[in-house]
Amino acid sequence: MKHKNGFNPLSRTTAHRRALHRNMVTSLFKYERITTTKQKAMEVRRTAEKLITRSKVDTFNNRRHAAKYIWDDDIVKKLFSDIGPRMKDRNGGYTRILKIGFREGDAADVAILELVDYDFEKKEKDTKKKDDSKKSDDKKTSKKEAGFKSSKGESEHKKNTDQVVDSSSNRRYNRVKGS
């Protein structure tokens, strides 16, 4: 007898489960690494592995089959032009599941689902560069908000707010006019 040989329904209706698979597979191929529960990761992994196997051979029929599972056309292009050729010499096992512990709110078993050739160091460096550029942009905007005079002679910040000084602790609170 073949008991429990199918799939895990994840306590969802069929339509909800299909939408969940599509969303998670799309996110996996977009970001190449997602954090989810262990059970969802194990189910999504099956779909992702099959799609990567199909993406190794770029045919119209394979693209159409992948488009049934992936929401965005740009992600389908990425799958066939980037991810598929990267996995060309691998015969399976394109994804890995890393257990990271239990979620604090409901103690669910949380895991990371990622592509095997995901380069964590490269992604980390890219985010550091973006953070540095955001900090420099924040400094520029904070100078503008700090009270530099505009062309009309008044700061934009002072036009819209009244400053109220609390004498007991010398703290300033901004209050919008008209409220």
From Swiss-Prot:
Residues 123-179 are annotated as: Disordered. GO terms for cellular component: cytosolic large ribosomal subunit. GO terms for biological process: translation. One of its GO terms (molecular function) is structural constituent of ribosome. The keyword Ribosomal protein applies. The keyword Glycoprotein does not apply. Residues 162-171 have a biased composition (Polar residues). It comes from the Bacteria. It holds the Pfam family Ribosomal_L17. Keywords: Ribonucleoprotein, Ribosomal protein. Residues 123-161 have a biased composition (Basic and acidic residues). Part of the 50S ribosomal subunit. Contacts protein L32. Belongs to the bacterial ribosomal protein bL17 family. This is Large ribosomal subunit protein bL17.
